[in-house]
Amino acid sequence: MTLQESDKFATKAIHAGEHVDVHGSVIEPISLSTTFKQSSPANPIGTYEYSRSQNPNRENLERAVAALENAQYGLAFSSGSATTATILQSLPQGSHAVSIGDVYGGTHRYFTKVANAHGVETSFTNDLLNDLPQLIKENTKLVWIETPTNPTLKVTDIQKVADLIKKHAAGQDVILVVDNTFLSPYISNPLNFGADIVVHSATKYINGHSDVVLGVLATNNKPLYERLQFLQNAIGAIPSPFDAWLTHRGLKTLHLRVRQAALSANKIAEFLAADKENVVAVNYPGLKTHPNYDVVLKQHRDALGGGMISFRIKGGAEAASKFASSTRLFTLAESLGGIESLLEVPAVMTHGGIPKEAREASGVFDDLVRISVGIEDTDDLLEDIKQALKQATN
């Protein structure tokens, strides 16, 4: 079946990347073969030679992700971190990068512990729009943003960042990368606002079932795609056919899962924001009080805030730990974006490797709790939050 330009997101989610099977199977088979027959030397029968280079299941997933991000090209990797590593590996030695300070701990670790050892220097800022013109240098090759950020849910105007890069005298060779993991392609499409590459830890919302580790990227820049595709094959950090198949299956219900999680998260965030007795502050893009709500209205489908919330609890680190250990439906675990609700304390978990001073400068305090709202009943989740707050603050 050929998709039409008028087809909506749900239709694309179900049918993009659809396979053609000689047996007529409705759901694509899993192609586990590592190698493919050739009719004569260097003359493959089909389009595949060796599964590290390409595999039917991976290709179908890549095409599907590209379609949902309004992109021409997609690539899949063995993890979100492998996606990040491959992009940074594409930069010339001696390059400079700019990143928001409030970034996923694993990304911060790669910038500071790996990329710098290979000749890529990174400048971090907590005020990107104001600082970017001064931070871009002659050797700057990349700007990296998350929006919303992990875990404080700051929202960045992607178009403004893209415009700043274009206007800068040294901006012509700078690529803008946006990590869209927290929202998924259902809520936002960064390429529409000037990003050069959009990346996801597909482990999270795209797969959505907490049973696959996988990363993806999408782009409309052909030379950039060809360079990254070369590195994908050369480095070999690719997902297995089964993981690609599982992720593609999860993607088909993305719109249903993400919308439900976002609707529940909005109600939970409103409750937390009203609880002045137990809660210091709430970070959630769907709240009209969010400092960048005007950007949310522009960049997010239906002004949805997504399924991620963070909040500071009264009582400090001890209260945060007690709250995280007192929930019934929210499982204390790292990761996010699955059908089940999760929570964590970033200061000692996902962001524990970031120095305290840098962490707190980005708003990640010891009393911060991050929750990933799943698709359980909204009222049940609210009751769980209420009882855990009571236990933690009394």
Curated annotation (Swiss-Prot):
Report the EC code(s) recorded for this entry. 4.4.1.1
**Residue span of region Disordered:** 37-56
Lineage of the source organism?
Answer: Eukaryota, Fungi, Dikarya, Ascomycota, Saccharomycotina
Return the similarity comment. Belongs to the trans-sulfuration enzymes family.
Function (record text):
Catalyzes the production of cysteine from cystathionine in the reverse transsulfuration pathway for the biosynthesis of sulfur-containing amino acids cysteine and methionine. In this pathway, homocysteine sulfur is converted to cysteine sulfur. Also has cystathionine beta-lyase and cystathionine gamma-synthase activities in vitro. Cystathionine beta-lyase may be physiological, while cystathionine gamma-synthase activity is not, as the required substrate O-succinyl-L-homoserine(OSH) does not occur naturally in S.cerevisiae.
UniProt name for this protein: Cystathionine gamma-lyase
Q: Which GO terms describe its cellular component?
A: cytoplasm; nucleus
Query: Subunit composition?
Result: Homotetramer.
Species this protein is from: Saccharomyces cerevisiae (strain ATCC 204508 / S288c) (Baker's yeast)
Q: Does the keyword tRNA processing apply?
A: no
Q: What else is known?
A: Present with 38300 molecules/cell in log phase SD medium.
Binding residues annotated for substrate, in chain numbering = 52, 104, 109, 334
